[in-house]
């Protein structure tokens, strides 16, 4: 039995609150159970130097955790003078995932940065960040269209992500921290709303997993992501 009595293939309760802060063109608080992430999308004129003159836009992301997002305080990375490897890996993952569903040529020379700040962590912070960032990005593009800066929406669809894992004999969806820390296999899966794969990150922490288990993990992830995309779409109707 899971700590919150969910079914093995069930995601946690998901809540997406749009327009959460006043200034960002896209601002979302996304909650997966007790994991809470603030995703703010900011629009900037111009693109990185290496893209100038190509008529393309750019979407990037930054990720961080507040010092008391976890049970004990962690130092801000700024006090160490540099970002940690985990942080850099996660923010690159978020950015890659978003760009997979954006037509950069349709943006013109505009850059959007999505800042994902973890307020409270209980497993799945990177997957929650991707899910919330997708909605924040959609709102940022809607802002550009409303202002007449874009004629068509460069976003081709939603992107969402979920963690899956093997704990004992069970394949679980959307692991909270106590499950994640005990799992034999931990995997993060990113998909488009059509169920196409963007990224799969999986590791056997304990027992190696079989090809059949891999297929089961992906099937559970696909179902979970379909449920998450439904919440994303519903949130954009508000």
UniProtKB/Swiss-Prot annotation:
Keywords: Nucleotidyltransferase, RNA-binding, rRNA processing, Transferase, tRNA processing, tRNA-binding. One of its GO terms (biological process) is rRNA processing. PROSITE patterns: RIBONUCLEASE_PH. InterPro entries: ExoRNase_PH_dom1 (IPR001247), ExoRNase_PH_dom2 (IPR015847), ExoRNase_PH_dom2_sf (IPR036345), PNPase/RNase_PH_dom_sf (IPR027408), Ribosomal_Su5_D2-typ_SF (IPR020568), RNase_PH (IPR050080), RNase_PH_bac-type (IPR002381), RNase_PH_CS (IPR018336). One of its GO terms (molecular function) is RNA binding. It catalyses: tRNA(n+1) + phosphate = tRNA(n) + a ribonucleoside 5'-diphosphate. The keyword rRNA processing applies. It holds the Pfam family RNase_PH_C. Its EC number is 2.7.7.56. Phosphate binds at residues 86, 124-126. HAMAP family: RNase_PH. Belongs to the RNase PH family. Phosphorolytic 3'-5' exoribonuclease that plays an important role in tRNA 3'-end maturation. Removes nucleotide residues following the 3'-CCA terminus of tRNAs; can also add nucleotides to the ends of RNA molecules by using nucleoside diphosphates as substrates, but this may not be physiologically important. Probably plays a role in initiation of 16S rRNA degradation (leading to ribosome degradation) during starvation. Homohexameric ring arranged as a trimer of dimers. This is Ribonuclease PH. The lineage of its organism: Bacteria, Pseudomonadati, Pseudomonadota, Gammaproteobacteria, Vibrionales.
